[in-house]
Amino acid sequence: MKKTLLASSLAVGLGIVAGNAGHEAHASEADLNKASLAQMAQSNDQTLNQKPIEAGAYNYTFDYEGFTYHFESDGTHFAWNYHATGANGADMSAQAPATNNVAPSADQANQVQSQEVEAPQNAQTQQPQASTSNNSQVTATPTESKASEGSSVNVNDHLKQIAQRESGGNIHAVNPTSGAAGKYQFLQSTWDSVAPAKYKGVSPANAPESVQDAAAVKLYNTGGAGHWVTA
């Protein structure tokens, strides 16, 4: 767009599917309809969030019309993302919020900017609000930026809301299903694309709050809020 254009804005989501057997191949080795998959990803087709593109395990990466697309599954969970080809910044992907978060509110359930989600989700959570776009690259109306508590980084009000919805503001939160971690529930691949060099490869949950805030701001400014399910 782990929805790793980051399915959490975007750090690069996962869905639950049945089956264990599968294969791993580059897209060039597989009979994929690249044009169709690219169009579905660009339009945030909910089919990609509800089920894998095929049964079993797979790992496909391909370039199409200026973007790099990635689809993967281990036979149990599945994920997908895309980003501008050759871009070193954030990708457009999303992830499910950590399971130790507070229960979602009614207004959370209506807010979906998901590229990467834990499946299945009910019909209500698949409907975007009338005031938001269904495009994963949507950006929020500029809001006043203020340093968050425990951090000297200026974080705008929209990002603060995202952090509360993703982790309840817990910088050590970890989603045991998707592996998303930290205050903003970064997938590792997304985190590595925006984190400082010394924190690449380190779990976001182990980074200081100011580092997490700075990474989230970078992701938000380059990819918009579409990375986060709760944006």
Swiss-Prot record:
EC number: 3.2.-.-
Induction: Positively regulated by sigma B factor.
EC category: hydrolase
Signal peptide: 1-27
Record field: compositional bias (Low complexity): 119-137
Gene3D superfamilies associated with the record: 1.10.530.10
GO cellular component: extracellular region
Role: Is able to cleave peptidoglycan and affects clumping and separation of bacterial cells.
One Pfam family it belongs to: Transglycosylas
Biased composition regions of type Polar residues, renumbered to the chain: 96-116, 138-153
Organism (species): Staphylococcus aureus (strain bovine RF122 / ET3-1)
Phylogenetic placement of the source organism: Bacteria, Bacillati, Bacillota, Bacilli, Bacillales
InterPro entries according to UniProt: Lysozyme-like_dom_sf, RPF
Subcellular location: Secreted
Family from the record: Belongs to the transglycosylase family. SceD subfamily.
The protein's name: Probable transglycosylase SceD
Gene Ontology MF, one: hydrolase activity, acting on glycosyl bonds
Residues covered by region (Disordered): 93-153
Key words, A-Z: Glycosidase, Hydrolase, Secreted, Signal
